């Protein structure tokens, strides 16, 4: 029986091995320890850099580190709000990027406003 983290790794490996032009990833790093999460984010961003990826995550820093565009889906019925962050450098962004903490703070405030 595989642990949650091992199941995540197997699922992620399958996605990375398939040659699909569009990839949907729903919380792909959620059951991983911090170091493995960071390493797999790096690997995933590099291996999928020429594909369209829709990443669903509840982690604002992960979204900002890996995304080209950020959108929030909320409400019932659901509405999508596109955020205008200037994500100029390519993912995966390094954690000491001076803009990441500022953007993370702004994104967290926006998420709180939506509750």
Model-derived regions: residue spans:
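Conserved signature/switch motifs of ABC ATPase nucleotide-binding domains
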Residues: 18
